Amino acid sequence: MFWKFDLHTSSHLDTLLEREDLSLPELLDEEDVLQECKVVNRKLLDFLLQPPHLQAMVAWVTQEPPDSGEERLRYKYPSVACEILTSDVPQINDALGADESLLNRLYGFLQSTGSLNPLLASFFSKVMGILINRKTDQLVSFLRKKDDFVDLLLQHIGTSAIMDLLLRLLTCVERPQLRQDVVNWLNEEKIVQRLIEQIHPSKDENQHSNASQSLCDIIRLSREQMIQVQDSPEPDQLLATLEKQETIEQLLSNMFEGEQSQSVIVSGIQVLLTLLEPRRPRSESVTVNSFFSSVDGQLELLAQGALESTVSSVGALHALRPRLSCFHQLLLEPPKLEPLQMTWGMLAPPLGNTRLHVVKLLASALSANDAALTHELLALDVPNTMLDLFFHYVFNNFLHAQVEGCVSTMLSLGPPPDSSPETPIQNPVVKHLLQQCRLVERILTSWEENDRVQCAGGPRKGYMGHLTRVAGALVQNTEKGPNAEQLRQLLKELPSEQQEQWEAFVSGPLAETNKKNMVDLVNTHHLHSSSDDEDDRLKEFNFPEEAVLQQAFMDFQMQRMTSAFIDHFGFNDEEFGEQEESVNAPFDKTANITFSLNADDENPNANLLEICYKDRIQQFDDDEEEEDEEEAQGSGESDGEDGAWQGSQLARGARLGQPPGVRSGGSTDSEDEEEEDEEEEEDEEGIGCAARGGATPLSYPSPGPQPPGPSWTATFDPVPTDAPTSPRVSGEEELHTGPPAPQGPLSVPQGLPTQSLASPPARDALQLRSQDPTPPSAPQEATEGSKVTEPSAPCQALVSIGDLQATFHGIRSAPSSSDSATRDPSTSVPASGAHQPPQTTEGEKSPEPLGLPQSQSAQALTPPPIPNGSAPEGPASPGSQ
């Protein structure tokens, strides 16, 4: 993408390319020449694609520079030229593939008589590989014209880069038909037979190993190709040639005839092991259901693959059988090796790579379960020899792994395929292991010897882990397996003393060791999958019961944790700003989450719910009481009865811890700040009204439309009761006596003179607030000659809190007879027929209620003279003016 979208910085190559005397070495010295080539710089490509420059780059890649040359000429220029030629630029690929002279110059590199330079060989192989991949037709047709191409490849097969070129020729051809043509061409050139000829004692070790690796890669690639391409027109000719018995016999002859070479034996065994490898099942048999099937089903698929491999490698098995004695002799008489000094002592003679590969080959031959081959191996007593090596080389874990796998396979092998199912015969391999090899006796003796050495302070035997698994395989196949009945019978045939020792060993040391080995070293925490990750297609598979139980427990755990998180991390409105002192406190609470399901445990939120419930009920009670008072006003209650209503308000406020006149309910800091700001504005407006004189009317319509409602309730801000009252602004202070002025919804006492409030409001008039304003259209009743009017707002007189409280105390001390006669003693609510408050006349404007500071209330309002009773001094009501 970096090159595609031209995200590189600008280069000065364009300026350099404008020079007429620019040389190719000078251009290759630039650091960004490769980047500019990959982004298809037109000027640069035009310069590089000139025939002299292309020939020079091919010469750098294929011709070895002089030893006395500069380092740039020997290493830098060939490396940069190879990168440019293999940069996969279409113009360069076309130029190389279309010019046969350049291809001949490249091909000339293989015609060198001596050994090839490994660095130049890698450059040559890389350039040829990109041409095989991009210009397949041109290059294949060019190579097929060369009669000595295969001979030259085999001549330089000792160079790893040439071996890679042969593999590129087999793998980089994408079109199936063209690849089949290449395979047939190489098979006609007898590439397989010629590679086997390279595995000969007369060749060097590099040729042995590279030729063997080439044959192994051909086998694996051909089998892989057969699996991927089901409808191939014809079988792979190279693989068919390799699996022929004649080809394997030629390989075995090179290994054992004449002077034996360890390199030849090891290289030949690698080819034989590749031929005996079990094949993978075909792609059509590997479905989703088989992938999610049980372990037994997967083992059956593997067994089928091994069976197919045995059938397809019949030629190899037949060719191998006459040479088994030669391989067994290698185990008994290994090639001469020098003793090795190990950390635990002297090893003489070492096992060696040759005998290790022989053990691998014989174990693979036993796993093939071929009757003739197995009979020959048992006749040579190969399993017993392998067990001798197992216990002799105490610390060779490579050998221990091979012998353990071989013994476990022999114990679980079924009857040979050619045996009759009606009359199954005894498995000769199992009988050979327990009788000729004395497997049980060897296990018991080695275990006791290891215990004795460890008790003396010596090291533990290196094969003890593998020996434990061999003993476990024997016990498992005795309990369940194709040879279970035969194994139980063979164990019963053991001496009685040995039977008792085996039973004690199985129930004692072996059971304890297996119990220790089954403990998980790391406890894995499975992640819970969300519901979005669930797939209905996976529900049809039967997962193990442990996984189902684990998932159920995790679901239960997540449910409990979710409820705990909600309980601990939630905040009420009042507590949201009061976070815990420690930031980690909510997370510390999660550590205390338990999974207790005790039904008797009380929920910590129960008390909180009860408090919130009572608070809500109390608010509803307040609303109902206010509605009762409003109905009482509409039915004609008196001023004295309003005082009793205010008393109930004071009592309820004391119960709730709130000042009188404030409704029950939570308030926020923002509301308190708004009230303080409005009070400051009212102070300024009240001072302006007082400066103009006391005759200024203080009641006027509210500035906006009022919501509908039958009545309204006045609210007063909390004011200290001992605050002194201020004199009137006009300087005149009238002292009156009479019934006390009521608190709460105030009305002008009956029989007192009233003043019309129809004058328009002043510009700087005081803005009054109302909690429950009454709409202008609400009709009100008038008593004793007053007519019914529809004022725009309810009428309200404003007095100071201190005077009202003093008046209220006067009522408590000297109640009037008329008040007591008209009040219901049980509810303190005015009874029916009581004096109704006077209503406003036509044109009157009723002010909205407002809780003013005490000083402003005293200056603006004075109570009217009351004819009866002796009440304390207080400000006059506006109705008396």
Curated annotation (Swiss-Prot):
GO terms for cellular component: cytosol; nucleus. GO terms for molecular function: protein phosphatase binding; protein phosphatase regulator activity; small GTPase binding. The modification Phosphothreonine is found at T524. Residues 10-403 are annotated as: Interaction with PPP6C. Residues 621-881 are annotated as: Disordered. InterPro entries: ARM-type_fold (IPR016024), SAPS (IPR007587). GO terms for biological process: regulation of signal transduction. Residues 814-830 have a biased composition (Polar residues). Pfam families: SAPS (PF04499). Keywords: Cytoplasm, Phosphoprotein. Residues 700-710 have a biased composition (Pro residues). The modification Phosphoserine is found at S232, S529, S530, S531, S635, S638, S702, S726, S759, S846. PANTHER family: SERINE_THREONINE-PROTEIN PHOSPHATASE 6 REGULATORY SUBUNIT 1, SIT4 YEAST -ASSOCIATING PROTEIN-RELATED. Belongs to the SAPS family. Protein phosphatase 6 (PP6) holoenzyme is proposed to be a heterotrimeric complex formed of the catalytic subunit, a SAPS domain-containing subunit (PP6R) and an ankyrin repeat-domain containing regulatory subunit (ARS). Interacts with PPP6C and NFKBIE. Interacts with ANKRD28, ANKRD44 and ANKRD52. Regulatory subunit of protein phosphatase 6 (PP6). May function as a scaffolding PP6 subunit. Involved in the PP6-mediated dephosphorylation of NFKBIE opposing its degradation in response to TNF-alpha. This is Serine/threonine-protein phosphatase 6 regulatory subunit 1.
